[in-house]
């Protein structure tokens, strides 16, 4: 599983259009509807901790897991600034370990798509089930194959900011349903730019595949919604 390295430095800059507050409100609303208003919550694939921080601000005792040391360094800086008591763990989400169980697990921003083998997805879901309290809730979002095939596939995204720029090239293999992201990042240092290159892979899953993985993990599907809706 790929970890963000050079991109971590500019991740929040280029993701400043992501509606983290809206996502947090949406996720927290579902948690509260299911009676989870406080207690331990795991943010699986937490990245730089943007949603982790917001959920901590709502009164949840947060744990964040990510496999990128660079991303967690930024998350820790946010934690120091906010004063929130968040535990961050540098772990691969496919093999994460906790000290005990939690009331809920969330995994936002298509983190589960980075697991490119269905067998490993089922194993990850089984781990989630293992660390959930009885009656606990697992909330996650994922990109379907449609998004990779019709929206992202073989497109190039580029942005130029004052202090950094990036080129994001997508190459989608419809047979394997794997989307390759080739990232080229330039970060200003004085009068020059430092260049980073990274390659990441995500898999486009069908709804059937995901529900099968949940069933194999021993979990019950409560609901499946389109983003920001209850439909």
Language-model segments: residues:
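Residues lining the SAM
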Residues: 108-110
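C-terminal lobe and adjacent flexible extensions of AdoMet/dcAdoMet transferase-like proteins
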Residues: 201-231
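Conserved class I S-adenosyl-L-methionine
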Residues: 1-39
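A short acidic, Gly/Pro-enriched loop at the edge of an enzyme's catalytic core
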Residues: 97-104
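A short glycine-rich, Lys/Arg-flanked "PGG" loop and its adjoining helix->strand segment in the class I
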Residues: 122-134
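Class I SAM-dependent methyltransferase SAM/SAH-binding core
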Residues: 49-95
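SAM-dependent methyltransferase
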Residues: 139-211
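Conserved S-adenosyl-L-methionine
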Residues: 45
